[in-house]
Amino acid sequence: QGKVLGEFSVKQGVKTVAIVDDRTAYGQGLADEFKKAAEASGLKVVATEYTNDKATDFKAILTKIKSTKAELVFFGGMDAQGGPMAKQMKELGIKAKFLGGDGVCTPEFMKLGGEASEGNFCSLPGMPLEKLAKGPEFREKFTKKFGAEIQLYAPYVYDAVMVMADSMKRADSVEPAKFLPAIGQTRYDGVTALIEFDSVGDLKGGAISIYQYKSGKLEYVETLGGSAVDLAKADVKEAVAEVKEAAQAVAGAATAVGKEVAAEAKDVAKSAAEAGKDAVKAGAEAVKNAAEATKAAVEKK
């Protein structure tokens, strides 16, 4: 997430960023990766501050950040700190944009941040269900079977279980010592993506989706990361399906028109043949009459 969020910051048109993390493994790791990506993308990190996962008063570090005139504040941490931090930024008159990871992409963040959460950005792993190539089909099957609306992580949990089942099948064992190594060789076409893992066990090409708080709810902004390719594939697949459907419709119409034209041509040919017969008959009659008239004239002389 940190890498993708660093790249997203550049797209926001900012040039300076301040970074705060809560010193937890999650928060610090996220902030460190964000910093690397931000600097690699040409952004200037004007402040790096730290707090902890129990704090609720951030005015001291935010006052320092305000003096740097940072255009964006990135927070590596959870909603319990992120919400109050966003609220205190507003109270201090800090105009910088606020950005965080999935730890602040929660209803609790909105509750704690109140009006100050409006316009802030956060991220969640994966893509929205409607953006997944197999998402609509999964939703339909899920609601039909369970009679309930699908939950956010349902397709990812489903794929996780199916990856384990696939690994057990390939290892021919349900013993963890035997099937866990097989997970590393996974190549599974799941609901969420084509699932493969790198040498350290991370998901290859994992997509990250960006959301923004608007009017008390999260709104999807865009998807970044390797699996954004899957998003493009889904769009292409949909376009191909539409083209195929249109082509079939055209072919069907052409066939119908062809049959109609053929039928009309057959009728015309039949009419022409009958007219030809009548013409030949009339011609023969005329020749016969002419012959008789000639004979009568000769006999008269």
Regions found by a protein language model. Give the residues of each.
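Composition-driven recognition of long, low-complexity, acid-poor segments enriched in small hydrophobic
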Residues: 228-298
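Extracytosolic ligand-binding ectodomains
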Residues: 1-248, 300-301
